[in-house]
Amino acid sequence: MHGGQGPLLLLLLLAVCLGAQGRNQEERLLADLMQNYDPNLRPAERDSDVVNVSLKLTLTNLISLNEREEALTTNVWIEMQWCDYRLRWDPRDYEGLWVLRVPSTMVWRPDIVLENNVDGVFEVALYCNVLVSPDGCIYWLPPAIFRSACSISVTYFPFDWQNCSLIFQSQTYSTNEIDLQLSQEDGQTIEWIFIDPEAFTENGEWAIQHRPAKMLLDPAAPAQEAGHQKVVFYLLIQRKPLFYVINIIAPCVLISSVAILIHFLPAKAGGQKCTVAINVLLAQTVFLFLVAKKVPETSQAVPLISKYLTFLLVVTILIVVNAVVVLNVSLRSPHTHSMARGVRKVFLRLLPQLLRMHVRPLAPAAVQDTQSRLQNGSSGWSITTGEEVALCLPRSELLFQQWQRQGLVAAALEKLEKGPELGLSQFCGSLKQAAPAIQACVEACNLIACARHQQSHFDNGNEEWFLVGRVLDRVCFLAMLSLFICGTAGIFLMAHYNRVPALPFPGDPRPYLPSPD
């Protein structure tokens, strides 16, 4: 039994020794490299030497863009490479050890920070280990979640696009000490933000159109002094407006259409029209308040959606004004307003023909003159001519008067047939006795006829003002409908032509994208 355990113990001891020897090589190398190493000193053999530092940005998630705070939140990996002559070794001296992992706090770092941050976090989120190669070159890939400042242009919101940037520079070193560069792969400079399709998470509100990168020199530095280099990574992003179209724009258009449709209510239903229009105004005000909570509080520009909502408010207010004017015209009467000939000609003849509206034909001019006489005459008005009576009285009264006259004539003829003298004397006596009664009857008939014709004239005047109100309501409906359609089309055509440029920088033909394979 003891003889069987001997080989196993020997193998276990050999494995432990080899592992300890491997760890000892890495520990020995780290101890040798860190001996007399000062991480605060720049890795330059001579004072005039410049340390080359290359940067590459990998975007894994565009988290959000807060318009009110004008802050872009991104999840990135920052790839930095530089060489430190103090960290060189010969792999043969350390049994072929080609890579050494060293805590980043133990080596010199170029102090690359995000200049345009908005939360006070300049550095990376995790100080992970650096990878050191035998030639002294260091590879560092720390992750970070940055909140960078992004100036928001709200002119075409929500059909807008934004140009945001992440600006990196060394916090302590100038161009005479370090040289910031963009990373290179296969001899090609990576002048763009790298996106790994497998690791990248698409944003639901923004679509990335361009992602170039550029080297810039600090323009604030004096010409005789060395400035600070900056590496700027740009993100040109286009908003996906579907959310705002479904939840704000479409409801506003439908609600405003309801305000347009109130013209189909009767002209005298002004109260109901105003009630519907004011309810629409309240709903539009709620949507305007929701938009105001989304966009930044700036006076540099007015958002496109705010312009459209304001336009809808103006249209709705005009509809309310139209309803009030139409109601005022429809309720007029001949006692309070006299209709001018021009108004009658335009609103009762010309416009109904143009608008294909059915309006009753106007009375002849003679009837109008006679009706005015009836309106202005006194209770003792007498019938002067048969033509005026025929024009003013209805057919039933004309038949009654003709029958009454024929009866009087027949009675007179019957009296005359009995004898000229007797008949004439009796006829004259009858006339004398009946004269006051006949006169009273005639005056009573005249009063009744005058009152009826005055009422008929009053009703005709009311109907004419009502017809004018109908025509005016139809004109206002067509005007508001045209204004609503033209304004809506014009505003959204402006949004249609607001597109991200085909190239990221005007005048620069380079696309700043990886060349196709």
Curated annotation (Swiss-Prot):
Subunit structure, interactors included: Pentamer of two alpha chains, and one each of the beta, delta, and gamma (in immature muscle) or epsilon (in mature muscle) chains.
Major subcellular location class: membrane
Family: Belongs to the ligand-gated ion channel (TC 1.A.9) family. Acetylcholine receptor (TC 1.A.9.1) subfamily. Gamma/CHRNG sub-subfamily.
Membrane-spanning ranges: 241-265, 275-293, 309-330, 475-495
Subcellular location: Postsynaptic cell membrane; Cell membrane
Keyword Glycoprotein in record: yes
Side Extracellular, residues: 23-240
Biological function: After binding acetylcholine, the AChR responds by an extensive change in conformation that affects all subunits and leads to opening of an ion-conducting channel across the plasma membrane.
Signal peptide interval: 1-22
Any single Gene Ontology cellular-component annotation: postsynaptic membrane
InterPro entries linked to this entry: Neur_chan_lig-bd, Neur_chan_lig-bd_sf, Neur_channel, Neuro-gated_channel_TM_sf, Neuro_actylchol_rec, Neurotrans-gated_channel_TM, Neurotransmitter_ion_chnl_CS, Nicotinic_acetylcholine_rcpt
Protein name: Acetylcholine receptor subunit gamma
Record-level GO BP terms: acetylcholine receptor signaling pathway; chemical synaptic transmission; membrane depolarization; monoatomic ion transmembrane transport; muscle contraction; signal transduction
